[in-house]
Amino acid sequence: MDRTQKTEWVGSLQGTLGDVGLVVVTHYSGLTVAEMTDLRGKMRAAGASFKVTKNRLTKLALAGTEFESIADLFVGPTAIAVSRDPVAAAKVVADYAKANDKLKILGGSLGSLRLDVNGVKALATLPSLDELRGKLLGMLSTPATRIAGVLQAPAGQLARVLKAKADKDAA
């Protein structure tokens, strides 16, 4: 990589870091190409991305961002998982690390909050933003459904009483 390519790469990574809410730092030593491809596919499906990084250039890109506190994690063969959803990248990385011990989670950052390995794993157990929205929508619609049921009940009872009276008179 020549100097201009490095400058472009740092600028590109800074742009990416400006758009995301979560960065997870991992060691990927020993992963095969097929395993890396599989992990990247799972990341894309979750709305996240996984990128192998050059440590020195990544430290330059982190300078001046809210993720600056994790710069010391970039030692050895590192890769980053990033996502806008604060849970997506953590969930995929934690699940993949459970299944494949070659992927090691070093830590991460949720905005300006630095996370250790346990923090990333704890974040992975939380429901995603879409799941939370679904639960909230369900909670909001439940009272309306119950009110509609209560309002319909007296009319149904009245109809059954009238039908019983009509059946009795007919007999």
Swiss-Prot record:
Q: Which family does it belong to?
A: Belongs to the universal ribosomal protein uL10 family.
The protein's organism comes out as: Paramagnetospirillum magneticum (strain ATCC 700264 / AMB-1) (Magnetospirillum magneticum)
The UniProt function text for this chain reads: Forms part of the ribosomal stalk, playing a central role in the interaction of the ribosome with GTP-bound translation factors.
The UniProt record lists the keyword Plastid? no
What are the protein's UniProt keywords?
A: Ribonucleoprotein, Ribosomal protein, RNA-binding, rRNA-binding
Question: Taxonomically, what lineage is the organism?
Answer: Bacteria, Pseudomonadati, Pseudomonadota, Alphaproteobacteria, Rhodospirillales
- Specify the protein name: Large ribosomal subunit protein uL10
Pfam families (UniProt xref): Ribosomal_L10
Q: Which GO terms describe its biological process?
A: translation
Its gene name is rplJ
